UniProtKB/Swiss-Prot annotation:
GO biological process: nucleotide metabolic process
Molecular function GO terms recorded: dTTP diphosphatase activity; UTP diphosphatase activity
Organism: Thermosipho melanesiensis (strain DSM 12029 / CIP 104789 / BI429)
Protein known as: dTTP/UTP pyrophosphatase
Family matches, as Gene3D superfamilies: 3.90.950.10
Keywords of this entry: Cytoplasm, Hydrolase, Nucleotide metabolism
Keyword NAD: no
Domain of life: Bacteria
InterPro entries per record: ITPase-like_fam (IPR029001), Maf-like (IPR003697)
Record function comment: Nucleoside triphosphate pyrophosphatase that hydrolyzes dTTP and UTP. May have a dual role in cell division arrest and in preventing the incorporation of modified nucleotides into cellular nucleic acids.
Catalytic activity annotation: dTTP + H2O = dTMP + diphosphate + H(+); UTP + H2O = UMP + diphosphate + H(+)
Protein EC: 3.6.1.9
Family the entry assigns: Belongs to the Maf family. YhdE subfamily.
Length: 182
């Protein structure tokens, strides 16, 4: 049975390629405006909606990632000013990256959430402006990509690095392996 990654994210595609399994991608079509304040429930709901939006037959894997700080979700910034403010808010502080993952195999739906703590170093306005001008913060939750230049913003990480990138591949591998999918 085909494995389908429900995403248009190049980062998630590259991460799943690391597992050396054959898969194809289909972009999910959902509206991401869900009224949910609990970050874990939010990412699990969104990943499930993404998976269920795929009409092709196969084993479907989907994910949704958010940055959570001070009891609020920091999704993808709306513009560069919003990106600047997000990064300024995260300066010298810990935040949590949540990724909800859903795997559908026939009628079986597995949904879980992975959490990783990230601490940013003290970020000057000049460094934030430099980062924003040389990277693409608008397509990333929290306005940064840890796997790219965003690594210069990070002081510490506790948990799964790949979760911060957007796909907790070790846990996904374990589920696929245990179910004899791979």
């Amino acid at each position: 049975m085909d494995i389908i990654l429900a995403t248009s994210s190049p980062r998630r595609i590259n991460l799943l390629k690391m597992l050396n399994i054959k898969f194809k991608t289909v972009a999910p079509r959902i509206k991401e405006n869900i009224n949910e304040t609990d970050p874990e429930k939010l990412v699990k709901k969104l990943s499930k909606l993404k998976a269920l939006s795929i009409k092709e037959k196969g084993i479907i894997i989907s994910a949704d990632t958010i940055v959570y700080h001070n009891n609020k979700v920091l999704g993808k910034p709306k513009n560069l000013d919003n990106a600047f403010n997000m990064l300024k808010e995260l300066s010298s502080k810990w935040h949590t990256v949540y990724t909800g993952v859903t795997i559908i195999e026939k009628d079986d739906i597995i949904t879980f959430c992975e959490k990783t703590m990230v601490k940013f170093k003290k970020l000057s306005d000049e460094l934030i402006r430099y980062y924003i001008s040389t990277s693409k913060p608008l397509d990333k939750a929290g306005a940064y990509g840890i796997q790219e230049l965003g690594a210069i913003l990070v002081e510490k990480i506790e948990g799964d690095y790949y979760n911060v990138v957007g796909l907790p591949i070790s846990r996904i591998w374990d589920i696929l392996w245990d179910r004899r999918i791979i």
